Regions:
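Short acidic-glycine loop/turn motifs at beta-strand connectors
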Residues: 110-112, 167, 239-240, 261
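Conserved phosphate-binding catalytic cores of ATP/NTP-utilizing and phosphoryl-transfer enzymes
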Residues: 70-94, 199-224
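Short, active-site-adjacent cap segments at secondary-structure transitions
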Residues: 164-167, 207-209, 234-235, 244, ...
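ATP-binding/phosphotransfer module of carbohydrate and carboxylate kinases, centering on a glycine-rich
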Residues: 1-71, 77-120, 126-152, 262-405
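Glycine-rich phosphate-binding loop of actin/hexokinase-like ATP-binding domains
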Residues: 220-276
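Glycine-rich phosphate-binding loop and adjoining helix at the ATP-binding site
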Residues: 115, 119-223, 350-360
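Short helix-capping/turn signature of helix-turn-helix
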Residues: 35-36, 215, 230
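Short glycine-aspartate micro-motif
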Residues: 94-98, 154-158, 224-228, 234-236
């Protein structure tokens, strides 16, 4: 099934430049309302520095496009009741396609980040053909969750994929020839043969970081290093309340951080953090002790009793995260390290506590200490994050850092 967009906002963008002052101020207002949940016109004018008249014109325009809705009037203050404006969940939608090393996800979210529909499929390793088959079957299922009128408000497809997915073949347990097919795979071209919508591609953990920034981050950290524990560990960076992707879109790739170590001959060498603090390492450890490891990939809520092997892995992960945190803090003065992953909440909390302990015992001379907190999106962060890409591109002040990737 081919989905074609009839979204009025997409048509509007084709007719006028989105780089003008009006579009910039629209993004500022949408971002502000997203951050605060809702806000009246007077508060928006105060926080943006725009005139009351300019705010009124923009708010009225966004309301006419069904992107904003009026909330109940706030009474009890001097003067007339104020009317807060909030994002309209039905105002726009994004589809996310997450390409994982062990699974595929297809997710539909609305403008405020609610998951309207989601599909998941496990795999031993990702192949080009299995992805296209999954997408073609799944896209029609997602569309069924919306009325024909709302389906016109789907703004695009965000794709989250591991950086250089064809590398680390031994660690991924996949044939090199199969993974090499991804080198020449053009996501935009192939997906557009199935879905006639704009396609945006980014790193999987950058996508997860964007989900935390847009729909989580309850402590309102302005600058934080985001860490996602998946099949391979990875991360993202937020600076000045903005997703920082770097020139080539791979900022925060902590999985590739080399950790000094001694080899069997006592010589100094290094090992990437991927090989210490990733889920596939736990899988190897459990298999070595005779455990069935299917639960790691089939459930993100509860793993049952995995005994001392899990405890050893948690300690190993925390050791790596504390090292990564110190290295990152030496380069940029982050407020916090935010840890999430495709793992049960109780396991994540143990990792956070263990990381805090190891950091507290580390040598911080010349480096400021930071908060260490759990992420708030969970195992679906990558999926929600890539579905959020079309929304960010259209409505967020972060759009410039994403659109060129």
């Amino acid at each position: 099934m081919i989905i074609k967009s009839k979204n009025p906002r997409l048509s509007l963008q084709e007719g006028r430049s989105q780089s003008g002052l009006r579009a910039h101020n629209e993004r500022r207002i949408m971002s502000l309302i997203r951050q605060h949940g809702s806000a009246p016109k007077a508060e928006i004018a105060q926080k943006t520095g725009l005139s009351a008249q300019a705010v009124t014109v923009i708010i009225n325009s966004l309301e006419a496009e069904s992107l904003l809705i009026r909330k109940d009037p706030q009474r009890g203050r001097v003067g007339q009741p104020t009317i807060p404006f909030a994002l309209n969940p039905d105002g726009a939608f994004g589809i996310g396609l997450k390409v994982g090393r062990r699974s595929f996800d297809l997710t539909l979210i609305d403008l405020v980040g609610n998951i309207r529909a989601t599909l998941h499929e496990n795999c031993a390793y990702p192949t080009v053909q299995s992805l296209l088959t999954f997408l073609e079957k799944g896209i029609s299922v997602l569309k069924m969750s919306l009325s024909d009128e709302l389906a016109k408000r789907i703004l695009g497809v965000g794709v989250a994929t591991p950086y250089e997915i064809w590398n680390w073949t031994e660690e991924a347990g996949a044939p090199k020839t199969v993974l090499n097919e991804w080198k020449s795979f053009d996501f935009k071209e192939k997906i557009n043969q199935i879905v006639h919508l704009p396609v945006y591609v980014c790193n999987d953990d950058t996508a997860a970081c964007s989900a935390e920034l847009s729909f989580g981050n309850p402590a309102r950290f302005s600058d934080f290093l985001y860490i996602f524990i998946g099949t391979f560990i990875g991360g993202g960076v937020v600076i000045n309340e903005t997703l920082f992707t770097g020139k080539k879109g791979n900022a925060g790739a902590i999985g590739s951080l080399p950790r000094p170590m001694l080899n069997r001959e006592g010589q100094l060498t290094s090992q990437q953090l991927i090989m210490q603090s990733s889920l596939y390492i736990l899988e190897k450890m459990l298999k070595g002790d005779g455990y069935n490891t299917d639960i790691l990939w089939s459930s993100k809520e509860y793993w049952g009793d995995l005994g001392p092997v899990l405890d050893k892995w948690i300690d190993q992960v925390a050791d790596g995260l504390a090292y990564a945190a110190l290295c990152s803090l030496a380069i940029f003065d982050f407020e916090a390290i935010v840890i999430d992953g495709a793992i049960p909440i109780n396991v994540r909390e143990k990792i956070v506590l263990a990381t805090k302990l190891k950091l507290s015992q580390a040598d911080h001379r010349g480096i400021n200490r930071c908060e260490v907190q759990s992420g708030s999106i969970g195992a679906k962060a990558q999926s929600v994050g890539c579905a959020n890409l079309p929304l960010l591109i259209n409505f967020s002040q972060d759009h410039a850092s994403l659109s060129h990737h």
